[in-house]
Amino acid sequence: MEGRLFLIGVTMGLYTWKSRSLKKNGGLDSPLRRGLWHGLFCSLAASAAALVLSVSMEKHTRFVFVGPNAFAASEFYPSIIAAIVGFVYGFFRGRAEPENKRGYFLLEDSEWAETVFSAVLLAATIMYFIVQAFKIPSGSMENTLLIGDHLFVNKFIYGLRIPFTGKRVFNFRGVKRGDIMVFSFPDQDPRDVHCGSVQYHRDFIKRVIGLPGDKIEVRAGQLYINDVPIKNEPYAHFSDGELRQPESVRAFDLSPKKYQELWQNHELDGILQDVQRDFFGPVVVPPNSYFMMGDNRDRSCDSRYWGPVPLKDVRGKAWFIYWPPARMGTVH
């Protein structure tokens, strides 16, 4: 969301700058030019509103549009339609402006664009660098986080992200085992299906189980870290009473090297399906990456299925539940 807000803010800023230049040079004196420029503003405003609304109301199923860096179709098409409608409306409204109100629409447009530029850039900066609100959409973190919980995520604790680089500066502390983190789904191919649907570009929230270099394995539902069984995890929740798959079909005769390779390349669940929920690994967490699991171990689509999470994809650390009031408090 913050990336979209930043784009909207920059666009409105450019519109404000160009409007001042055109008015100063008399470039908007004719009715036709005023209509075109007012149409452009209405087009930008309508497409921005449609984009924000579509992202806010986006459902779990996403329809991917063209390439891996493109907008989802659920965001792209409403924005295009809104832009066209906004331009047509603005063009005829601006062109029909009476002589006694010449420039009224353009002045109003510039003021609105400047306001949006300032407000949106401020909001995008806060969301990108400092804190952002999220809503829990599934039960994968029960009973720590419940469906419908609203929480703030600390975006700077692991360092301030440098836009478009994947790098961080001013690291306040490193990632620790047990941290609950929000991250972007690590597989960068928008066509890949994981856990039954396309997960590309979605935000996930899970708990850090494995740090770089850790050996992770699950045997009959029991988690092992560096060959040590992890007992009495206070946050782990198991909702099924039986193992989903027998160990005899666990690895489909995959060599340890091939198993690790498939896991790191986010391809393991395409071969093993649901086997790895109760029988997984062993794998070694690669450098600058983390092994993530949901607290609801039997109902979580996590690193057992789609691989490690690189630090560059980490959005921040879950910090504080602010809604509903009965569950208000810090996240552990």
Language-model features, listed with the residues they occupy:
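Soluble "head" domains of membrane/secretory-pathway proteins
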Residues: M1-A49, L53, T61, G67, ...
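Conserved active-site regions of diverse hydrolases
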Residues: R93
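N-terminal Sec-pathway targeting helices
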Residues: E108-V116
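Hydrophobic membrane-insertion alpha-helices, especially the h-region
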Residues: T115-F129
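Aromatic-capped interface at the extracytoplasmic side
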Residues: M127-G139
